[in-house]
Amino acid sequence: MQTTTTGTTLGTGTATGVGTTAGVRMRIIGRADSDSAGPGPELMAADTLEGDRVVNLNGEDLGKITDIMLDVQRGRIAYAVMSVGGFLGIGDKLFAVPWSAMSLDVDRKCFVLDANKDRLEAAPGFDKDSWPTMADPTWAQSVHEYYGSRPYWEEY
């Protein structure tokens, strides 16, 4: 993922780079300056993101966020787990998407992932009863490479 700075346009709205270190950041698309009281969109409770839609750059629905995975040792968000397909959690496939591979669109209230449906379906996924060992460096590196995202742990 390329970093952005305040004022860089991306699709619709304005993108604002957010994070504590340069390089790997979540992009926020939409309102450059929040006029609402409260913490968001720069600081949000993880459970408020669960259930959010994920769309691609063409606006096609890809899935929804089911979990936010934290790297507790580094104090970083590592992945968003996205559910694709199925009905009411039955028959869906899960994907761990590097946090830095997505953008948050506050105007449309969704995440944006630069991947078409075919690319996503070919991505390394898993089912709800067989999660990968996400702390495994080989697995983590391959997921970041698949999405073209710089690994968050390289920032420290």
In which residue ranges do the predicted regions lie?
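Peripheral interaction segments used for macromolecular assembly
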Residues: M1-Y156
